[in-house]
Amino acid sequence: MPTIPVDKEDLFKLLGRSYTTEEFDELCFQFGIELDEDTTEDVKGTDERPQLKIEVPANRYDMLCIEGIAQALNEFLGNTSAPNYKLSPSKPEISLTIKESTYPIRQYAASAILRNVNLDERAYDSFIALQDKLHANLCRNRTLVAIGTHDLDTLTPPFTYEALAPKDIVFKPLNQTKEINGEELMEFYEKDKNIGKFLHIIKDSPVYPVMLDANRTVASLPPIINSDHSKITLNTKNVWIDVTGTDRTKTEIVINQLVAMFSRYCKEPFEIEPVQIISEHNNETRVCPNITPRTAKAEISYINSCVGLNYSGEEISKLLKKMSLDATPSTEERDILDVKIPITRSDILHQCDIMEDVAIGYGYDNLKKTKPQAESLVAAPLPVNKVADILRLASSQAGYLEVMPLTLSSHDENFAWLKQKDDGTKAVKLENPKTIEYQVVRTTLLPGILKTVKENRKHSLPIKVFECGDIVLKNPELERGAFNQRNWAALYVGKTSGFEMVQGLLGKIMQTMRTPWLENPSKDQRRGYWIEEDKENTTFFPGRGAKIYFRNADNAEAKAIGSIGVLHPEVMNNFDIPYAASSVEINAEVFL
């Protein structure tokens, strides 16, 4: 979790009173943050000011600076209400046009203006420190999002955000005296400890993103560095903020956090000047920032049951107010709270987050200790796990050993090595795999079992192994886009293929699950199973593979639940196994 150093005297001034170390430590504990260190004793006799080093949750981006910590604690203590952010003027007078050329490298941008700001030295330092903390945490070292802040009075609106060839971008980088182009900039900062670590983000791109004003003056080269021309100082009165990124959601979160924390220093506190974002090529034209609170619903009964309370909607609303959330009982549904989530609380994603805030507002120390009911102490296996245990026992009784391979595999192992083609509809792929071994989440248990046999091929024959585990398949209709499926698979490896061995094992499994073999399924409409030749499955030797069909009730529609067959010699060669083998795999969830 991030540790935020704040000036002790300034923080206590913002909180309206002084605290002993023990008192402030207790306040932090109640709120869910942690006082890591008080440097008062360490700086005695020096010119340094005492600091409090506070550890905050990684998802509380609003607490990455002293302003946010003080605001959150003051609301928790009841000293103040949540700020009322407002846009002025309501219709933007300044625009930022995003060109289509930015799409391949850094396609999203957001912007806002803070007018008539009054920053003293410590507020200025806090402004810079917040950007650094956001860059290190939410922005993932500027790979996802990068921030630029500028003295608006040195630039001429409207602004454009586009991508140009490196040699065409010429400007004086921050705190430098000489103009250089994009190519020279990469060489100049290559060994710089601060800037050098960000160069790789765009270095190999044929174009670099750049922020320009109406006179084509460079304001920044995101995500590397700002221009010295528009740098902010203690004398800056009007601040233009630009945020660029590859992630739309995180870009919006960052701009909201910046304006929420530092609009308090405007002549009219919490007043923000919007910017018109013009992005016609992808229909992203909008007014930025969007300070409209998000809305969510939470069940009163759910909150009470989780926290152990018996509070009304009004009482819960008072607790949520301490956590910056504006809640009111729904006028339409008796058990529902309508919750407004401010722009500072991007960590609120689900009603469980709202429930957690109720618990913090109530105080964990105030929760009564109660004995759980005896029946709540008795656990029971999930149905899918119970089925899996039955299949494991039956397989073991048949003389098969259980293996537990990894759920990730390489793309080739999951498809090409099994003589299958990836049509893009099944496998969940890792975006940034660390190694070629972990490119996809397996869609079948077979590759893992074959890899296990490969590493144990020196053992005496036959090798009989099985696995009962999850595979993952895509489903775009689901919110998460994919789902887990519990499968059971077995493999027989020997000098002969041993198809009769895996067929016998399948029969034992079905007998254990009280599922009879149907000799003539077209006439016999009972619950049961049968197999039919599968000419399309190229994993198996031609004419030696079949689909397994299952009817889960009398007169019900049958469906294919798996496959059985003799593995193709090429498959065995791909996994470096010099023997013949047969396999069987079924969806175990059909027995639920």
Curated annotation (Swiss-Prot):
UniProt domain B5: residue ranges: 291-369
Catalysed reaction, written as an equation: tRNA(Phe) + L-phenylalanine + ATP = L-phenylalanyl-tRNA(Phe) + AMP + diphosphate + H(+)
Biological processes annotated in GO: phenylalanyl-tRNA aminoacylation
Keyword field contains Cell inner membrane: no
Any one GO cellular component localisation term in the record: phenylalanine-tRNA ligase complex
Record key words, sorted: Aminoacyl-tRNA synthetase, ATP-binding, Cytoplasm, Ligase, Magnesium, Metal-binding, Nucleotide-binding, Protein biosynthesis
The UniProt record lists the keyword Metal-binding: yes
Location(s) in or outside the cell: Cytoplasm
GO molecular function terms noted in the UniProt entry: ATP binding; magnesium ion binding; phenylalanine-tRNA ligase activity; sequence-specific mRNA binding
EC number: 6.1.1.20
Cofactor(s) of this protein: Mg(2+)
Coarse class of the protein's main subcellular location: cytoplasm
PROSITE patterns listed in its UniProt record: B5
Subunit composition and interactions: Tetramer of two alpha and two beta subunits.
Similarity comment: family membership: Belongs to the phenylalanyl-tRNA synthetase beta subunit family. Type 2 subfamily.
UniProt-recorded name of the protein: Phenylalanine--tRNA ligase beta subunit
Organism annotation: Candida albicans (Yeast)
